[in-house]
Amino acid sequence: MGSSRLRVFDPPLERKDSAALSERQLPLPTFDVPYFKYIDEEDEDDEWGSRSQSSTEDDSVDSLLSDRYVVVSGTPEKILEHLLNDLHLAEVQHKETETLLDDFLLTYTVFMTTDDLCQALLRHYSAKKYQGEEENSDVPCRKRKVLHLVSQWISLYKDWLHEDEHSKMFLKTIYRNVLDDVYEYPILEKELKEFQKILGMHRRHTVDEYSPQKKNKALFHQFSLKENWLQHRGTVAETEEIFCHVYVTEHSYISVKAKVSSTAQEILKVVAEKLQRAEEDLALVAIMFSGEKHEFQPNDLAISKSLEASGRIYVYRKDLADTLNPFAENEESQQRSMRILGMNTWDLALELMSFDWSLFNSIHEQELIYFTFSRQGSGEHTVNLSLLLQRCNEVQLWVATEILLCSQLGKRVQLVKKFIKIAAHCKAQQNLNSFFAIVMGLNTASVSRLSQTWEKIPGKFKKLFSELESLTDPSLNHKAYRDAFKKMKPPKIPFMPLLLKDVTFIHEGNKTFLDNLVNFEKLHMIADTVRTLRHCRTNQFGSDMSPKEQQELKSYVNHLYVIDSQQALFELSHRLEPRA
């Protein structure tokens, strides 16, 4: 067993807590996990004790999961206080302390506001004594611990903190406090430099310059610098990226990844390239559900939430301005089929991986927390996650669209074979998000009912598809997928809907508060699941395709052509193979 100590407040509470745990019916781990019992506001002066949970698991499991403990529950202030007490200023933290710190920073928004955390950290930083136990010589140590926590917080949240007014003001305030304290406590010089490095500032002074007479001048000089960390991003409205749907017919659209600030001309350029038409021959028009039409001028902003709720963007040929759907399906479908059939399946899967990775790599771990707990204003905090989920849905629709728009049986059979190979390559490249989407697309009812098409698929392809399908089998809590994914080494992309389902299962199966105390055991389990993202991104993905090959595939993959109406897909399916 590991040698980690367990601290327990008030031994009489142990019996009460054990009962509480059984009543909660939390999923108890079968491996050896010491538990930190309830941290409460009372009994602050009680002695520390220890307790561990015995295990019957084998040594291999024990060696992997020992030396870890979980704070079961407590008030936010007490959890933070314990965390600061256990922090070490050494380069490497104890594993259990590092886990607790990460759990806290990942999930604090569940039980306290950012403003509450900022105020609590300022109180701890400014405290001259802590419960009468620390001597004055320990004050700088306390300050350094707070600064270490803040550094980890900034590192984890990155640009998110730059968009929150409370955190921006807090960082300015604590930076000012460090500048004031560094003369009295020179040991803070290291933390000050690290803090400035994180904030993107460059200090122009030495400790010797921080005499009381020079403090104000130095402080003014510091804040006259351009604070790069505040300018790292523009406003959310300007930089936020979304998938803009530009409809070609009533039920089919081209998906364009664009910034909210994109002009009509910028979007039209992408659409024209996708349709292989001259840009000057096309125009964009907004058609409201009321029937009202508005043609976009080149410099008009084409994306707005009000338009999304009340109408759609269509592209049309100027010489056919009087028709609503100028691009007939038959006109484009054959060219589209020939185009994808001429593409290399491995390279196409590689470009899918490249596109998905750019979305996946942009997701903040906290987005899963916001998405699950549905806190107020979560929409703007889950932009990247929503994009990847939307992408998964679009890839599924893309597969069905391409197959059902191919009117020739022989070419349709080739397309199905093509998608089976692409799915296999996505699995090999460890892009499980697109892998699932393609398999689900092939299993869409409008595609799977094409008996004449599937009858002509060679046996080896049917066998391969059956093997791929087995990985998506949901039985035993998706055991086949979980076992395969666990063996894959980073970089890899998980099937995000299932990861969200795991987090949601933990959330809905356990209360967030127990007797007005934060159920931190639940939050630890959620944080552990969310850290899957970090593990998947331990290594970065890089494509080795030539720029010329990549450009054509990138243009195709970035702007998939899909039909988003299940009714329209079924109509196409019955048109290809009428019901007997």
Swiss-Prot record:
Domain Ras-GEF: 344-579
Intracellular or extracellular location(s): Nucleus
Predominant subcellular localization, coarse grouping: nucleus
GO MF terms held by the record: GTP-dependent protein binding; guanyl-nucleotide exchange factor activity
UniProt entry tagged with the keyword Transport: no
This protein's GO CC annotations: nucleus; plasma membrane
Function description: Guanine nucleotide exchange factor (GEF) for RAP1A, RAP2A and MRAS/M-Ras-GTP. Its association with MRAS inhibits Rap1 activation.
PANTHER family in the cross-refs: GUANINE NUCLEOTIDE EXCHANGE FACTOR, RAP GUANINE NUCLEOTIDE EXCHANGE FACTOR 5
Protein name: Rap guanine nucleotide exchange factor 5
Organism the protein comes from: Rattus norvegicus
